[in-house]
Every structure is written in structure tokens, then in C-alpha cells.
Amino acid sequence: MEFPDLGKHCSEKTCKQLDFLPVKCDACKQDFCKDHFTYAAHKCPFAFQKDVHVPVCPLCNTPIPVKKGQIPDVVVGDHIDRDCDSHPGKKKEKIFTYRCSKEGCKKKEMLQMSCAQCHGNFCIQHRHPLDHSCRHGSRPTIKAGCSPVTASESKPSGDPHPGSWRAVPATQVLVHPAHVNAVTSVWGAAALGW
């Protein structure tokens, strides 16, 4: 051999392999081959000095200090039970926080349902403008396709045709100003019995 001093034998008692590129353990300062250079592979007695892991709380993401000899899982569990600010069992949040603005209604909802016209907060039952008697502007808003007067409101006493369209007085129907003359002539004809 030309280079008798080249390389070192592995310090692992069961190996003793001659390695030309040995790795020195930074904890115990001994030389090892590629198979035994890790702390676990050669059972390094000083590994605890170098193998330091700081556990992090999964709820609040804060590092938890662990003393030597303590089990990290137990320490993190104690932190969650006692010190953690993000523990879901400690703080009790109200789920139903949005109260209905309709007078006389005491329902609360999980989600905010506000009226696009009056910007009030309402429950599911009163969320539509007609359901909460929305007064945006001077008169109640009526959506297209909705009847302005319900059948129960269109039955004046002494009407010969209950529930008919003639039973509704002209003052209750919202009409475009251009059609006022046509409507009054129809109502006049209805009053005459035509």
C-alpha cells in the first residue's frame, strides 16, 4: 500500500470498517463510516446535547420549552390544557349573534341577512322586503310578479263578488302615472257594473 495512514476505521464496535472518507460525530468526536455516522446508528451518548427539538403548540403556534427528561407530548398537552390561548374549549363563542330587526320577532341567526334596501338585519322568515314591511322611500317596495294586495285584504264587506279584482279599491293599487287614466276608466266601468 502506498498510503498506509489514509482513512480511518469506524469507531462502531461491531463494524471497524476502513473508510477513506470518515465522518466525525460532532457530539462524541469519534470517526464513523457512512452507515454509522448518525446519532441513532452508533447510539451516541451525547446525542441529547445536539438533538434538540422544540415542540410547537398546534393550536397557537408558540414554541413550548421542554426540560431534559420530559416527554414533549406530555408538555404540549399540559400547555393546551392550562396556558393555550387558542384552546377551543376555553372560550365559548355565541353562534346565533344576528338578531332579527322585525318588530316583535326575537329570532337570531348564524349568518347576517341584511335587506338591500333598508339595510336592516332579519331572520330567514323576514329576510324579503315584503315580509318585514320594508319602507325604503315613501311606499312599500313590491317585487315583480308579486301581488300588491293579498286575497285576504281584497274582501271588503258587502261585496257581490268576493275575492275578485273589482273588490280592490284603486287607492291600494300601485300604478305607473302614465296608466292612471286607463285605470280610473276601468274602475269607473266596474263601479257601474259593466
UniProtKB/Swiss-Prot annotation:
The keyword Cytoplasm applies. One of its GO terms (cellular component) is endoplasmic reticulum. GO terms for molecular function: zinc ion binding. The keyword Flavoprotein does not apply. It is found in: Cytoplasm; Nucleus. Residues 145-164 are annotated as: Disordered. Zn(2+) 2 binds at C25, C28, H42, C44. Keywords: Cytoplasm, Metal-binding, Nucleus, Repeat, Zinc, Zinc-finger. Zn(2+) 3 binds at C100, C105, C123, H126. A zinc finger (AN1-type) spans 4-52, 94-142. Zn(2+) 4 binds at C115, C118, H132, C134. Zn(2+) 1 binds at C10, C15, C33, H36. GO terms for biological process: proteasome-mediated ubiquitin-dependent protein catabolic process; protein targeting to ER. This is AN1-type zinc finger protein 2A. It comes from Pongo abelii. The gene is ZFAND2A.
